[in-house]
């Protein structure tokens, strides 16, 4: 069984091939996944991507990655995505600004002056090298690449290999958990 963890950085997954743009002590394969995935067609069982997709600086790289993921996945395979949600970020700013600021200070640690939700949203959008996805945009990109998008729960999956991988609980993040099935 071949399982690849895309953009693994300092968060490798044991038993997975950990792939990142830069070499590191826990990186098994160095590759620019925004330009292609270095595996043969239909050779990968599972793909995991935590925050990687939102770090790609150009939407063309997102399209390339999704197309390549579809190419390398077996028909019975699945790709799990965890990525920041534009909807959840804006919802938190509107409904829970104090939580958003407290979470930022705890998880990110960059100073906010003034410590407000509006300042945080602007800073988050500026600092993110890539894209904050809303569901409609992500679904359009995923559909075009040949996948069906499903929102899933924290550490939940019909695929045993994809259960228990999530690093952050829903109360600790504005991210969303998705799985993409080849169609």
Which positions does each model-derived feature cover?
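Conserved SAM-binding loop
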Residues: 3-89, 178-182
């Amino acid at each position: 069984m071949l399982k690849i963890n895309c953009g693994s950085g300092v968060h490798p997954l044991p038993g997975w091939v950990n792939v990142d743009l830069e070499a590191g002590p826990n990186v098994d394969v160095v590759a620019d996944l925004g330009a292609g995935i270095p595996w043969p067609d239909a050779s990968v069982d599972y793909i995991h991507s935590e925050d990687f997709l939102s770090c790609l600086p150009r939407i063309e790289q997102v399209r390339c990655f999704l197309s390549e993921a579809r190419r390398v996945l077996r028909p019975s395979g699945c790709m799990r995505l965890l990525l920041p949600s534009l909807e959840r970020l804006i919802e938190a700013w509107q409904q829970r600004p104090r939580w958003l600021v407290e979470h930022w200070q705890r998880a990110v640690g960059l100073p906010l002056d003034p410590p407000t939700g509006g300042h945080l949203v602007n800073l988050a959008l500026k600092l993110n090298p890539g894209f904050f996805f809303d569901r409609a945009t992500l679904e359009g990109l995923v559909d075009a690449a040949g996948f069906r998008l499903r929102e899933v729960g924290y550490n939940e999956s019909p695929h045993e290999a994809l259960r228990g991988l999530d690093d952050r609980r829903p109360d600790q993040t504005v991210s969303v958990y998705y799985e993409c099935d080849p169609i």
